[in-house]
Amino acid sequence: MLPSTSVNSLVQGNGVLNSRDAARHTAGAKRYKYLRRLFRFRQMDFEFAAWQMLYLFTSPQRVYRNFHYRKQTKDQWARDDPAFLVLLSIWLCVSTIGFGFVLDMGFFETIKLLLWVVLIDCVGVGLLIATLMWFISNKYLVKRQSRDYDVEWGYAFDVHLNAFYPLLVILHFIQLFFINHVILTDTFIGYLVGNTLWLVAVGYYIYVTFLGYSALPFLKNTVILLYPFAPLILLYGLSLALGWNFTHTLCSFYKYRVK
């Protein structure tokens, strides 16, 4: 059995729900269970979530092999434990406070920046990207012979979180140690270091996203998800030639947000 949700029509005259409706009810129940566990920290496996975070840097394929195992044992691709999301949120809060400190922001400015980053950059943009990728993958990437299967929205969101974590660590943590004394010095070395960190971070996001969708056996042509590497490398080269410092732009944007 392919690890996905079957959507074959099984409508009967006796009023029994077809498989599509049943899948929706099942998805709703799983979503409710996931949200309920957000407030039950003792039920979360933080050790396993931390292990996943480590392997997203060293061997992201191993993380997606665990998604296969979850599908076989719990009949769903998406995580049923919000521990990863909780740890990611903690990382995001701590690193954003660090950004506020490095940019010499006051207490209330840092809190305002934190709300912007968490609610808009992480949650809002994350929901938008997950929904877009969920639609594209189901609309254009499902194999013709596998039309009875679809990508779970929760899985699309998990793929985004997986890809977002390395980007967060590189741009919101590692970069902090270089901002004031290297990156923002308005020199070639400054924007070389800063823009290279951006190249690695965004490249990681693209690659981990590709791995997430290529792990689904009922999808085709997932290699197209690697195509953004071409404009990314082109943009990187142009930025060095034109002296465009991505991190300087980000810092200016953050300061503008909290005015």
Swiss-Prot record:
This is Protein unc-50 homolog. Present in periodontal ligament fibroblasts (at protein level). Residues 1-82, 137-163, 209-222 are cytoplasmic. One of its GO terms (molecular function) is RNA binding. The modification Phosphoserine is found at S6. Involved in the cell surface expression of neuronal nicotinic receptors. Binds RNA. It is a multi-pass membrane protein. The chain crosses the membrane at residues 83-103, 116-136, 164-184, 188-208, 223-243. Its main location: nucleus. Belongs to the unc-50 family. Keywords: Acetylation, Golgi apparatus, Membrane, Nucleus, Phosphoprotein, RNA-binding, Transmembrane, Transmembrane helix. Residues 104-115, 185-187, 244-259 are lumenal. The modification N-acetylmethionine is found at M1. GO terms for cellular component: Golgi membrane; nuclear inner membrane. The gene is UNC50. One of its GO terms (biological process) is protein localization to cell surface. It is found in: Nucleus inner membrane; Golgi apparatus membrane.
